[in-house]
Amino acid sequence: MSTHGWPVRSLAAQLRLPSGPAGLLVARRLNRNNREMVLAAVEATGAVPGERVADVGFGGGSGLALLLARVLPGGQVRGVEVSRTMVMRAKVLLRRPIARGSLTIELGTATALPFAAAALDALITVNTVYFLPHLEPAFGECARVLRPGGRLVICLGDPVEMADMPVTAHGFLLRPVSDVQRALTAAGLALDGHRRAGQPPFSFHVLTAHRP
């Protein structure tokens, strides 16, 4: 597949910022293709009932439902997305937990999270780091909203394998995993683990850290 065709560029744009009818289709694709990564991220939080957790850049929203299953009863999930289309979709599909107060959905960015300091016990973000021009400000914001001891889980595709995907030639920043780890420590987070999972050509990395 050419890296320059309109369909590839269009898909890249939708993966970066899902919007409109095409964005709704992309949401379903995200839930299907990212399922293993999202499951791994949610599991790595170690979240338990009563905790306050967030999914930043929740995309198709599958992580929100999985987090709810872990923290209820008594807990709360907060979802943040830069895409208005994804926010509106999630508010419709997940209106029941929203009405009960166990889920909030908000428009926001990774560098300006709509949370108070030390508001969260855990936070996940899956397949988002490729769209951040600078990692340290975003990770610093994660550190701000986590309580002391609060956990951060980042899942990202293997950068070497992703470089062979035509879509990543259009606006994806594919960094070595070691660069992501360095940005985490520079933001004041303590690294806890790094696990490689999945199978080529869709291997991925699960990074865990916490706020000291």
Show which residues each predicted segment covers:
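Short glycine-dipeptide loop
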Residues: 50, 73-74, 146-151
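Conserved alpha-helix/loop element of class I SAM-dependent methyltransferases that forms part
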Residues: 32-51
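Core SAM-dependent methyltransferase catalytic element
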Residues: 197-212
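A short SAM/SAH-binding and catalytic strip from SAM-dependent methyltransferases
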Residues: 121-135
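A short acidic, Gly/Pro-enriched loop at the edge of an enzyme's catalytic core
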Residues: 111-123
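A short glycine-rich, Lys/Arg-flanked "PGG" loop and its adjoining helix->strand segment in the class I
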Residues: 136-148
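Conserved class I S-adenosyl-L-methionine
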Residues: 151-181
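Class I SAM-dependent methyltransferase SAM/SAH-binding core
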Residues: 52-112
